[in-house]
Amino acid sequence: MTDSDEDALKVDQGPSRDIPKPWVIPAPKGILQHIFGTSHVFQSICDVKPKVTGLTVPLKVREYYSRGQQCLEQADWETAVLLFSRALHLDPQLVDFYALRAEAYLQLCDFSSAAQNLRRAYSLQQDNCKHLERLTFVLYLQGQCLFEQCAFLDALNVFSHAAELQPEKPCFRYRCMACLLALKQHQACLTLITNELKQDTTNADVYIFRARLYNFLQKPHLCYRDLHSALLLNPKHPQARMLLQKMVAQAQQARQDAGILAVQGKLQHALQRINRAIENNPLDPSLFLFRGTMYRRLQEFDGAVEDFLKVLDMVTEDQEDMVRQAQRQLLLTYNDFAVHCYRQGAYQEGVLLLNKALRDEQQEKGLYINRGDCFFQLGNLAFAEADYQQALALSPQDEGANTRMGLLQEKMGFCEQRRKQFQKAENHFSTAIRHNPQKAQYYLYRAKSRQLLQNIFGARQDVATVLLLNPKQPKLSLLMTNLFPGMSVEEVLSTQIAHLARLQLEQMVEGSLQAGSPQGIVGMLKRHELERQKALALQHSWKQGEPLIATSEELKATPEIPQVKPGSSEGEAEAPEEEEEKEKEKKEEKKSELIPSKVASLSDSYLDQTSSASSMSFRTTGTSETEMSAICQEYRSTSATAVTFSDSSLLKTQSSDSGNNREALSHGPRKIKATQGQRQSLSKTEPTQSQRRNSSKTKATIHKRNSSKTKATQSQRRNSSKTRATQGQGQSSSKTEATQGQRQSSSEIEATQGPRQEPSKTKTTRSPRQRPRKVKAARGRSWRPSKVDATQGRSRGLLRSSTKTEAFYDSNWSLSKTEYAQGQGQRSSKAEGAQGKSQGMSSTSSKAESTWGPSPSLSKTEVDQDLTYYEAV
């Protein structure tokens, strides 16, 4: 625009401008009338004449309006602004010209001038909403331009002003949020978003916006909540899906970090990481399962139970593996919680927790064991026993359950002892031994109970077992003094009672090891290794001079009874030649068969009897009551000490004759020294008797008999002492016995038998395995007729086929004592009949002998051996 145009505009604007008039002192009223008087010529001077402008201004305004519209159409924005400005100078109340000039300023990107003109227009016409909408639009454009120019604070002010003008439009608030985020004023932005969501809860974008803000602020649980709300409003929202995948990836990463920390033992850090994973993905049940496990390991049981229950609520039907894992962890949590209560002394709470666990799982042995421990501490021994039994039913070889059952049975046995119920106490101690056979104190307690029950043999065997397990066991010396008077530990361990105790103990331990051995190749290798070790131990025992045990094949091949080796104190020494033959046979049998079947059967029968009975017997047929009474009567005549124990054991068990013989051995009489002198006086007579009996017919008869007892006497002939030699040659034919019977009167026999009822020092240490049946005949002087001897010969044949193992043990247990009985007790049938008449047998004794004679359990040699044993005692 040129200067001439401006001057013309100024000239045109002159008439419409209000020119201020100078202030003058107003003339007083009536001054003109006072001056001019009554003349009316100058009276019209005071009247103000109106200006005539109505025609000029509207014409100019119309001109500027038309010219400004043309400029807008021609995009001449500056000229339009000038024309509209001139028109507004002519008439400032023209609202439309403000709006038109604002459009021209808007096209010139002068948002401030445009907004100012629109405000002026809106202020003049507030009822016109178009001006307000246009104003807010201009402000939006202005704020957006400032935002793009990174003038975030100015943009925030502009958007805030627009939001104030039109609060119903959220777009201005959204732009304010963007400006606050750009200014890193997150809390202010979060507050603004929260206020926005209070007004409008149907916009998924707002939830996603706040979810992103929460994720940025490391508040994943709030982020996931807003994301979940956004997906509910719009399940296919792409931004929501992208954010969800991002959160799942963050959760998996946190889960891996937690696993690494848990393996390293940093449980607290692992718990923090798994918490972060759950916050990122709270719908994954595996994360709660992991966190519950961490809680359980940190002994935060309430949180663990809550997480596991939440897992069970979250899993679906197709997630069976997850359900099993959650249930398993829940059971372990209950169990660990119960253990924690147990350590704190809250046993009742522990029982309640384990009850919850056992309602869902009945196949877990640990739960029963722990509940049994709680019951044990509460004093409910019956419930504790039931739980331990259930645990053993699930796992019979569980070491912890067997140990606990042993302790429980021990305590129950003590309770029964206090109530004077010694039989029940013995049963409890036997149960404890069955569950823990290597615990020495259980055998000691059972020995005391058996001693009170007058089961002396069982008590001795338990004491021998204690010596094998723990010779330094407290309170053992008193029982040894009572049960093994005058014997040292080595002497007790060298007896056959100790040998049987060792066999039983080895069998029980071996049974437990075999039952607990693993299956498959590993178990087979372990069994082979155990067998090899047994073979080496057996070979070592032969080298050390322990008693040799014949196998079933040797017993069948030779009816003779093997002797005990020189290392043992129970039997006589063998000749060197036979000893070498025995060792060769043993080595050959060891290669083919590591464990003899006969010995195993013996130990089996022994185990069965000792578990419930008080005396052991390897015989199938026991003695009758008449035989027992006769034995006891003859034994009373020998020693008062032996009477007490023998009678008590017989009254208690009425068992086999071998058990009674053992009881009699340990409680020997005190008259040994007194009778040794008398025995020495008779030693000269014995060689002559034995030499006369040593004829060819004797050997023939011995081989015809083929009894195991006869070989025992043959082996004994090789002994060095004259007494043993004569005793070993004691078996002769019937003619030799008749000759001896004619040469010796009945009085001489009685005199010889009387002083020989007490053994020498060598015989006192020998085995107690004696047979009491024929003792009655020898001591009662009721010698049997020839028919009875024939019947006994037949019975020996039956005995060899059925009880070969019994004969084996009989020979090992009573050899030296048999020699004396064989040396003096062989008589012919005629001599026996004459002696029976001369001695005046009673009808009772003859009936007892006739009943006892055809018994298939004993041969004549066995009876003589038993007689020698009781004489020794």
Curated annotation (Swiss-Prot):
Q: Which keywords annotate this record?
A: Repeat, TPR repeat
Question: Composition bias, kind Basic residues: at what positions?
Answer: 694-708, 763-784
TPR repeat start and end residues: 61-94, 96-128, 136-169, 251-284, 285-318, 331-364, 365-398, 406-439
Q: Where is the composition biased (Acidic residues)?
A: 571-582
* SMART domains in alphabetical order: TPR
- Which superkingdom is the protein from? Eukaryota
Please note every region of biased composition (Polar residues): 600-626, 639-663, 675-693, 709-750, 800-828, 836-860
The record's listing under InterPro entries reads: TPR-like_helical_dom_sf, TPR_rpt
Positions of the UniProt region annotated as Disordered:
1-20, 553-626, 639-873
Among PROSITE patterns, the record links this protein to: TPR (PS50005), TPR_REGION (PS50293)
Ranges of Basic and acidic residues compositional bias?
A: 583-593
Name recorded for this polypeptide: Tetratricopeptide repeat protein 16
Q: Which organism is it from?
A: Homo sapiens (Human)
Q: Which gene encodes it?
A: TTC16
